[in-house]
């Protein structure tokens, strides 16, 4: 998969190339990350990529032409169909289903905004295909959201993780939050791990984990349950949990 990033701070992306899951994905030649600086596509001697907004107001706006030229250059780096995604607080909120969708693409372009944003004509003229947000808050630019997106995509790319089951047990993969995890020692701070995890009974452990996952989702993110069609087993386990607690059923 080719991920082309358009950013005025290309060195920020050196970090994700050198560590963790993204480094492994690159080393295995499963993902390639390329960063283009729109300053290289400006036609003024000062390499400015921003200007004052028409109509007045605070801050500066990223100009359309260098971004447009950078996008075209990024598109030319692959013969595969490509979509351009603008990291923006006005976009649709990123979730696991979107990550899975993007992970199947062969080429994507991520546009990182700065200042007060980009010239609206890039959106009006459909040069940008979609806006993506990582939450209802504002950052200084689109670089960190782009890194979040890249890390998530690399994690679900087949062949990156040694154990593919780890992905299937992540929070949100099946619409639920993850179950609790424990490791050595057996007792820490006077708290022992649940006996079921020492039993060796894999079917009971699997049921316990499903119960914990359902309970945690119900208590912390009940909105997620409203989006799911639960199996009969899941409904039975959830009702069992709800009957033992005071929290209203959903």
UniProtKB/Swiss-Prot annotation:
InterPro entries: Alpha/beta_knot_MTases, tRNA_m1G_MeTrfase_C_sf, tRNA_m1G_MeTrfase_TrmD, tRNA_m1G_MTases_N, tRNA_MeTrfase_TRMD/TRM10. Its main location: cytoplasm. Signal peptide: none annotated. Its EC number is 2.1.1.228. The keyword tRNA processing applies. It is found in: Cytoplasm. GO terms for cellular component: cytosol. One of its GO terms (biological process) is tRNA N1-guanine methylation. It holds the Pfam family tRNA_m1G_MT. It catalyses: guanosine(37) in tRNA + S-adenosyl-L-methionine = N(1)-methylguanosine(37) in tRNA + S-adenosyl-L-homocysteine + H(+). Keywords: Cytoplasm, Methyltransferase, S-adenosyl-L-methionine, Transferase, tRNA processing. S-adenosyl-L-methionine binds at residues 113, 134-139. GO terms for molecular function: tRNA (guanine(37)-N1)-methyltransferase activity. Belongs to the RNA methyltransferase TrmD family. Homodimer. Specifically methylates guanosine-37 in various tRNAs. PANTHER family: TRNA (GUANINE-N(1)-)-METHYLTRANSFERASE (PTHR46417:SF1). This is tRNA (guanine-N(1)-)-methyltransferase. It comes from Buchnera aphidicola subsp. Baizongia pistaciae (strain Bp).
């Amino acid at each position: 998969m080719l991920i082309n990033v358009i950013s005025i701070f290309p060195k920020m992306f050196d970090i994700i190339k050198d560590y963790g899951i993204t480094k492994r994905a690159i080393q295995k030649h499963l993902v390639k990350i390329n960063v283009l600086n729109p300053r290289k596509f400006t036609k003024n001697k000062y390499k400015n990529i921003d200007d004052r907004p028409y109509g007045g107001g605070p801050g500066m706006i990223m100009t359309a032409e260098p971004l447009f030229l950078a996008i075209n250059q990024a598109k030319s780096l692959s013969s595969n169909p490509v979509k351009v995604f603008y990291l923006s607080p006005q976009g649709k909120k990123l979730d696991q289903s979107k990550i899975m969708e993007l992970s199947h693409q062969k080429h994507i372009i991520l546009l990182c905004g700065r200042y007060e944003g980009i010239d609206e004509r890039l959106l009006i003229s459909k040069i940008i295909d979609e806006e993506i947000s990582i939450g209802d808050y504002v950052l200084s630019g689109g670089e960190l959201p782009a890194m979040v997106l890249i890390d998530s995509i690399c994690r679900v790319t087949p062949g990156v993780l040694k154990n593919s089951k780890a992905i299937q047990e992540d929070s949100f993969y099946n619409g639920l939050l993850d179950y609790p995890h424990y490791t050595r020692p057996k007792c820490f701070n006077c708290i022992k791990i649940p006996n079921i995890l020492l039993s060796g009974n894999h079917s009971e452990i699997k049921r316990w984990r499903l119960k914990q996952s359902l309970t945690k989702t119900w208590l912390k993110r009940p909105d997620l349950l409203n989006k799911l069609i639960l199996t009969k087993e899941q409904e039975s386990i959830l009702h069992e949990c709800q009957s033992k607690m005071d929290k209203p059923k959903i």
